[in-house]
């Protein structure tokens, strides 16, 4: 037992670099803490303190207290936990009897006694066979899919190695070593160039934000000078006495100083970084009432309870509050010196309640309206993943309370530069001070595996081993899916409950509080759950379905590991989930601009999932404008699955130039009406399924120029290639529905305007595809075919793209860079600039404008020695061009915002499907969104559309639903028997 009641972390000591090693200057006054055996009896003086802490990689102010001793810091070691109530009949091992051991993702075999075929690609219906039927109601909550086929097919994402039977891909993900390797081995003394580049003194932009967002923290670094000694002392005294903290963390101090000085303040911090303190502490110190606008009643209730526990006057005016309670709050607000320091309200309450606005006017007149706080400020922007119309009405707060102006604080954890700009414009706080914390969550491991029949069960078994008795979240797309997953988890031996909008308010609150109190393990929820939840020990977050946006995914995964301990974030990826999301978007009544934005968000998530080469942490972080060196992830204890594979084998992935084949497909696509992506990929490989072979030959599709060009690709590679054309914007999958069949949806490939321009020669472009070339089961013939394709370097591929996008910047930068390197060569007595960097290398630098050491190291002829020697000079020169590019992209971003507001952006739309010779005429087929069908209880008839030209089949009868007629689109009743998945897009 540690005798010290409070242990303070010593400031970091000075380090000395020598060669490839780092030495720490010893502390001559070091005193070892006193330890003694306590006979397993807990000393009451060593009570744990609940304090959230997140390691965000670049924080300037580490916490000054060690609040608790954690059980594990590695994915290899199971985390022990206190006993908890477990309603499940098959509870996991308790912490009392559990002996920590070493668990590796490679060592643990799932279900060793039951070998099974692994579904890399979940079987779904393809229009080459028969159209799918999907049943859903207005809210999409009663969606259900029929039994899956037993056919084993390949997925889209090529894993590092194909798994053998009985071995799930999840077992191949390596966990963090429990003990570091011996430092006496030669291997431990050798470092790669990229590792050295990461650890050397940095002159790049790693950990900094691009020019879109300018952090104002430096302006508020001197608290004594800004506040005065007395006010500053009161600030820290209140921090300790009311909130129990000794120091601020992240950007809290600067945000609070800005608020205390009366500035409008915009706070952009990740989940769990302590945003709430930025307005709660000023509310306690300064007189008056702080009005907090929050989107969820559950979130409001949680905050109110916390404040009252801390002895801070706090009330909430919500729709479910009784009249007597409301009268009491209004009376207190009207008193001469209200005891209420924080008043929580919803945006709907502000827009609907005249009495509340009258109270605000009265407080403002008396000088007691301290500030407005807009929590979850991303809800203001239509670009935000959780846009709420009532939030846009909050702009009136600036107009109504302008003399004197009432300060506004806006806070969010998930806002891209575009959302920040839009939100500031909406709230009329363009001149607000901006404070940004790093988006890097070093303790989270990001992972992705194909969504297959037993994927979730295998993952759950692994979580039970790694985190026995610990909490987790499984996010689902619909209410029905939540209930299905909850039953699966219960059967697997985990205690689980559901949380979605279909539950009444009391039940939702009860479920949430029970989960926070550790009365059950896993909560199966829609995205309605989690906002503002203060539970630091969530050990895993699993996305059973595709999230709606990158911002939403980051926010939802951010609910894991808020205590700073290693935690696991996994996505089960199926491409057809994107079609489900698109249907929900395209059925909605939105402007073309908003619809375009939401569709683009889904496409960004698909690109994240289809990616096999770029660090997932880098993709997430840079989505928010922060520059990140992926080598940091690769060297961490929690590398993402991409970096883990790269760490094992840096040559596992090769980049191929597939431009010629892509152009051939685009030219042929207009001749192939009703073609699905899967059918196109089969033609490209020359590997049509048996049922469609005859029709393809009859229609002449086997004579198309691109037929059988991709023989060297696996099925998943070919699918990724075709989907790449969708992601790049050359192909668009248009969704169609059938009158009288509200459940049926079809996705057919069509050329976009950019695709037509490329096919017609009006523009030129390159298309590249990353392929995993080290798979155990890849046939030799396939490797030979791949070897005949053009392999290019990452820098070469990016060079051509950037040269086109910023041609004038490239020209000027190339000239300046050549002059710089020539001068360096002359001063070093070298023959010329190309003795330092090759001509190709100089062009690549000018085109790519690398912002990190690792990016610079990828340049042709660049080595670690050169990065160390010349990196600072190169980065200093590039800084000017970084700024120019950022300014252009910021202007483009503002233009997009303007178009969004006017609805000028049009993506998709609903065109009439033209019949193709050789295909049966279907006069009653309508595009999705073109109107409903007949209402009533008549029998439904499934449309037998297809992509390969087979004859139509007889209509398939569906059993009547026990639920009766729905109130959904077209009044169609959901089918109860489905033998295939729902959409004609192949899933993972």
From Swiss-Prot:
It catalyses: Couples ATP hydrolysis with the unwinding of duplex DNA by translocating in the 3'-5' direction; ATP + H2O = ADP + phosphate + H(+). Its main location: nucleus. Disruption phenotype: Reduced viability, increased rad-51 foci in the germline and an increase of meiotic crossover formation in the central region of chromosomes. Reduced number of rmh-1 foci in the pachytene region. In an smc-5 mutant background, defects in diakinetic chiasmata formation, compromised chromosome segregation and aberrant distribution of the condensin II subunit hcp-6 in meiosis. ATP binds at residues 248-252, 272-276, 562. Residues 256-433 form the Helicase ATP-binding domain. SUPFAM superfamilies: HRDC-like, P-loop containing nucleoside triphosphate hydrolases, Winged helix' DNA-binding domain. Its cofactor is Zn(2+). It is found in: Nucleus; Chromosome. Residues 46-119, 148-185, 930-988 are annotated as: Disordered. Residues 478-480, 580-583, 676-678, 687-691, 736-742 are annotated as: 3' overhang DNA-binding. The N-terminal region mediates dimerization and homooligomerization. Both the helicase ATP-binding domain and the helicase C-terminal domain form intramolecular interactions with the HRDC domain in a ATP-dependent manner. The HRDC domain is required for single-stranded DNA (ssDNA) and DNA Holliday junction binding. This is RecQ-like DNA helicase blm-1. It comes from Caenorhabditis elegans.
